[in-house]
Amino acid sequence: MILLVQLMLGVALAASAGLRAWLPLFVVGLLARTGQIDLNASFDFLSRTDALIVFGVATVLEFLGDKIVVVDHFLDSLGTFIRPVAGTLLASSMLTVTEPVTATVVGIVTGGGTALTVHAGKMLTRIKATAALPLHGGTANAALSLSEDFVVGTWLWIAMVSPWVAFLLALVALAVAVWLIMALWRSGKHLLAVLTGARKNEPRSIDLK
């Protein structure tokens, strides 16, 4: 039962990392530093002073940068590599009753995969918001960013209070992200088919020379 709860908590934290890479790491590191939670011994470095300073500064920079047009898209692109790593660290560090190697492998599969999927859904939401409101894309993205800040903060609190509920929220986030990815894939295939068909139907010029 303990392992199941730790797995669910790890997935929930990883899902939140799909929206914000650094805040979950900072919160988990701080809670571990103050003795509120335990980490897998191999991941105790998350609660070191230097790690907390890096996580704290990065959290502030991510919070501010995500509200600025162009910078937010750059951070999302960078997050494609950072957030899965953050998700892996969070999920692995929660598995205190398993060996470090096992915890790392499980963390990569559950945490890294979850964070990457949620991150992809977030990126697609931002793209759709910019495309739907080209003149107000920056405002729309800033509003979405603030809502994500609220969601992640609330999510982290719920995860510490009730891992079961946080895990269910993670499943919902994963379902929405997968739906967005599939919707974009279908629309992309449809657009490609339309463009290909249009080119095939283009009248060819006849050379009379």
Regions found by a protein language model. Give the residues of each.
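Small-residue-rich segments of transmembrane alpha-helices in multi-pass membrane proteins
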Residues: 80-92, 138-154, 200-208
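Generic transmembrane alpha-helix signature in multi-pass membrane proteins
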Residues: 12, 89-94, 122-130, 145, ...
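The feature identifies polytopic integral membrane transport proteins across all domains of life
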Residues: 105-109, 129-144
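Alpha-helical transmembrane segments of multi-pass membrane proteins
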Residues: 55-65, 111-122, 179-182
